[in-house]
Amino acid sequence: NINVLVLDFYEVTFMDSSGIGFVLGRYRIVSSFGGNVEVVNLSQRLYSMMKLAGLEKLVTLKTK
């Protein structure tokens, strides 16, 4: 069983809407199995972008 999928964004310096779509797609898959998604090591800029997109309501967001 999948409990938590951790996406490490440590080396990610740029992301557009396709990145948001990637995270949402993984959320849909993992949540269908009862799991959660964590996005970790986000820069402040990427954290703000994901929060603006409303992802903090679906996944756990953690900054560097």
Labelled PLM ranges:
Residues 60-64:
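Short acidic-hydrophobic, aromatic-tinged amphipathic segments that line or gate anion-handling sites
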